[in-house]
């Protein structure tokens, strides 16, 4: 055993490998190690970072043509569906909210100008059940040319039926100038018709409940704006330019602790 070991000749540490004669006969051994394909491999959640960076890159080179708000429904998969389909169980609600924020920006692009990459990215995250519902809920005019739309403002909700006519306007069965006693509420309710110069072109029947006159007139205002777009799609830009409200999400600001109201403060008294 010791004789066989004595016959082995080791390389001197002071000499390079090229100085030995039999170097070509010695097999070159390299350290074999795995090189990951994904640059995010060494991060805490590689799958999430890969998807997020991919969407961010698509958004960077996507055309910046924004559609109207009513054409941008939110219809993304739930967190549980995302974790199962994308094999990403580590992502939390906060992380998935970052992904949906990018998807909302991509979804705001006008469909006619979306690139193939944008369309494919959106299709991967769209909930199939929501797609069916939006198809069934597509608003159309009936056989008489009447549109039925709904509007909200504060705690008030309104349903408006509108069809071509002579300018009649009823709210809960009463003429609108009788139902809304203050001029400011009357003007706000009919503002979309006045802005589009259609005061005498349509008959309007509105049903409204909840809230006070300010909220009810705002709900009727929003519903009429939607009805005008259904009746005449060419008025969409006019309604947008004249600042007609389609969806007003403002709410009453909550009262703060230590204050009499939301913003009002108690008088400071020196003690």
UniProtKB/Swiss-Prot annotation:
Keyword DNA damage appears in the UniProt entry: no
Biased composition (Basic residues): 252-271
UniProtKB keywords: Mitochondrion, Ribonucleoprotein, Ribosomal protein, Transit peptide
Coiled-coil residue spans: none
Disulfide bonding pattern of the chain: none
Entry's Gene Ontology cellular component terms: mitochondrial small ribosomal subunit; mitochondrion
Region Disordered, residue ranges: 251-271
GO molecular function: RNA binding; structural constituent of ribosome
Transit peptide feature, positions: 1-11
Localization, UniProt: Mitochondrion
SUPFAM superfamilies linked: Ribosomal protein S5 domain 2-like (SSF54211)
Superkingdom of the source species: Eukaryota
PANTHER family in the record: RIBOSOMAL PROTEIN S9, SMALL RIBOSOMAL SUBUNIT PROTEIN US9M
The family this protein is said to belong to: Belongs to the universal ribosomal protein uS9 family.
Protein task: Component of the mitochondrial ribosome (mitoribosome), a dedicated translation machinery responsible for the synthesis of mitochondrial genome-encoded proteins, including at least some of the essential transmembrane subunits of the mitochondrial respiratory chain. The mitoribosomes are attached to the mitochondrial inner membrane and translation products are cotranslationally integrated into the membrane.
Name by which UniProt lists this protein: Small ribosomal subunit protein uS9m
Organism from which the protein derives: Schizosaccharomyces pombe (strain 972 / ATCC 24843) (Fission yeast)
